Amino acid sequence: MRVLVKPAQSPDGFQSIALCWSEGRTQKDRAIRQKHEDRFLADSEKLAKRIALGRLRTSAKIYETIGRLKERYPRVARYYQLAYDEQQGQLSCLEDLQRKQKAESLDGSYLLKSSRKNLDAEDIWRTYILLSRVEAVFRA
């Protein structure tokens, strides 16, 4: 597993910051987003079928259901525009590819902050990994 660590500047100057990127974290982030996206799209298709079959008729209920759907999948709902056309009685789902690609480019990236200014980026990362392993031992 490859990990890249770069130092970054704190805006206030009172913290040490490390910008990290990990291949493993990238794969994990993509898998999580894909799972949520599949579920979101499946649920939006179910909603469209309910509307088409006449099970949901009032606009208020339809918009409420759209809101619940967006609330249930906030990680991926921001990349889609769900719109209900009242005259045709259809639900449309449009994907915002630019926004999605921008988020995908950040997969695997994370910031580590420390109040200890004497630590460089590598030391911050090593301390983070050590603490993560200690936490895992206590959880086991």
Kindly label every feature range from the protein language model.
Residues 1-140:
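Anion-binding and metal-coordination hotspots
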